[in-house]
C-alpha cells in the first residue's frame, strides 16, 4: 500500500475508500467486499447445521429422530425441513409461528430455512469472492463462472423445487441419509433417472471425472525429466518460466490411441470446464422443471401392452411399477397427516408376480 505525505482531501478521506482499502488489502485470508456476504452467511449456515444435527429433533416435523442427542450418527443426523402445514413460511425467529421462542423455532424446523437461505447466500458470496480476486489480479472470471454450476444445483434443489411444491417440507433435509431419501423420492414421484436433464447431468459429472483422470495421468506421463527432488512437487521451481510437460508428446500419444487428440491447451482446458459446468446447469434446469411437475419420458405404449399381455415386460415397465411402489410407501410414511391408506389391490404388482 502506498502512503502519500500531505493532507487528505475530502475525496481521499471518503468512507468508501477507507473501507475499500481495509477490505481489499493483502493479508493471509483475503476479505474483500464479497467477504461481507460470504463470511457471516457461511458461519451461520455451518453453525446452524452443527447445532441442528447435534441437538434438534425432527419429531414435530417428520416424526423422526435426527440428532446426535437422540442417538443418530453422522450419516443419519440431519437438519430437517419444516412440516408440510407451514407451507413456504420463512419461519423467522420473531415471526408469528415461533414468536421469539428459540426452542419452539427449532421444533418447527426454523433451522432448515436458516441454513438453506444463509447457505445459498454464502455460496453466492464465494462466487463473488472469486470474481473480486480475479479482477484484483487481472485474471479472467472463469472460476466464478464455473462455480455457478454448483450454485444453480443448490438453489434449484433446495429452494426452487420446494417453492414449486406445497412447501419447504418437500425439499431435502440437510443430512446424508436424508439426501438419499430425497433421491428415492425424486425417482418415485418424478421418474428422475429417465429425465433427459438428469441424463445430461450424469454425462457431465462422470464425463468430467473421466477427463480429469485422463488429463492428470497424461500430464504425469509426459513430465520432462527433472531435478533430484523425491517427487514431482519438489522437483520443479513453482516460478519457473518453462513448461513442465510435453504437449506434443501427449498429442501424439492420444492421436495414436483414438485417432484424434487436443492440439491446443486452451481448447482442452475449456472443454474440461465446459463438460461438468454444463452438466450441472442442465441438472438444475431439470429440477426447475420438476418444481413445475413436468414429466420425464413416458413410453405409454409399453405400459399399455404390459398391462394387457402378462408375458410382456420391459425394464421400463418394471421401473414404472417400482416407482409406484415407492410412491405408495413414501406417501403414507412421509405424509401421515394426510391419513393415506392404500388397499392391497391398488399396490403395484409386476407381471412376474
UniProtKB/Swiss-Prot annotation:
Q: Quote the record's binding site residues for pheophytin a.
A: 130, 143
- Residue(s) carrying N-acetylthreonine: 2
Q: What is its EC number?
A: 1.10.3.9
What is catalyzed by this enzyme? Answer: 2 a plastoquinone + 4 hnu + 2 H2O = 2 a plastoquinol + O2
The residues the record assigns to binding chlorophyll a PD2 are 198
Anything else of interest in the record?
2 of the reaction center chlorophylls (ChlD1 and ChlD2) are entirely coordinated by water.
Spell out the protein name for this chain.
Photosystem II D2 protein
Q: Which organism is it from?
A: Antirrhinum majus
Which gene produces this protein?
A: psbD
Amino acid at each position: 500500500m502506498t502512503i502519500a505525505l500531505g493532507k487528505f482531501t475530502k475525496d481521499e478521506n471518503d468512507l468508501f475508500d477507507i473501507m475499500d482499502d481495509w477490505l481489499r488489502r493483502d493479508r493471509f485470508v483475503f476479505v474483500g467486499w464479497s467477504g461481507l456476504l460470504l463470511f457471516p452467511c457461511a458461519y451461520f449456515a455451518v453453525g446452524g447445521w452443527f447445532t441442528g444435527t447435534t441437538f434438534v429433533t425432527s419429531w414435530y416435523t417428520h416424526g423422526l429422530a435426527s440428532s446426535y442427542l437422540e442417538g443418530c450418527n453422522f450419516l443419519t443426523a440431519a437438519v430437517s425441513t419444516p412440516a408440510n402445514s407451514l407451507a413456504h413460511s420463512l419461519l423467522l425467529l420473531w415471526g408469528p409461528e415461533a414468536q421469539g421462542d428459540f426452542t419452539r423455532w427449532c421444533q418447527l424446523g426454523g433451522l432448515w430455512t436458516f441454513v438453506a437461505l444463509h447457505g445459498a447466500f454464502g455460496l453466492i458470496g464465494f462466487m463473488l469472492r472469486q470474481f473480486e480476486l480475479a479482477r484484483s489480479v487481472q485474471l479472467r472470471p472463469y472460476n466464478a463462472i464455473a462455480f455457478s454450476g454448483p450454485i444453480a444445483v443448490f438453489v434449484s434443489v433446495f429452494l426452487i423445487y420446494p417453492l414449486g411444491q406445497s412447501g419447504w417440507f418437500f425439499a431435502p433435509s440437510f443430512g446424508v441419509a436424508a439426501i438419499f431419501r430425497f433421491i428415492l423420492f425424486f425417482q418415485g414421484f418424478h421418474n428422475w433417472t429417465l429425465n433427459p436433464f438428469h441424463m445430461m447431468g450424469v454425462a457431465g459429472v462422470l464425463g468430467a471425472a473421466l477427463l480429469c483422470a485422463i488429463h492428470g495421468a497424461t500430464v504425469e506421463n509426459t513430465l520432462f525429466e527433472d531435478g533430484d527432488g523425491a517427487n514431482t512437487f519438489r522437483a520443479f521451481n513453482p516460478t519457473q518460466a518453462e513448461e513442465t510437460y510435453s504437449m506434443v508428446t501427449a498429442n501424439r500419444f492420444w492421436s495414436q490411441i483414438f485417432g484424434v487428440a487436443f492440439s491446443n491447451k486452451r481448447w482442452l482446458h475449456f472443454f474440461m470446464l465446459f463438460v461438468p459446468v454444463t452438466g450441472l446447469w442442465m441438472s438444475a434446469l431439470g429440477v426447475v422443471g420438476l418444481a413445475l411437475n413436468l414429466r420425464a419420458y413416458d413410453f405409454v405404449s409399453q405400459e399399455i401392452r404390459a398391462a394387457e399381455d402378462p408375458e410382456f415386460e420391459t425394464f421400463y415397465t418394471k421401473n414404472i411399477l417400482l416407482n409406484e411402489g415407492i410412491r405408495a410407501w413414501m406417501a403414507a410414511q412421509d405424509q401421515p397427516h394426510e391419513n393415506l391408506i392404500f388397499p392391497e389391490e391398488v399396490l403395484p404388482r409386476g407381471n412376474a408376480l
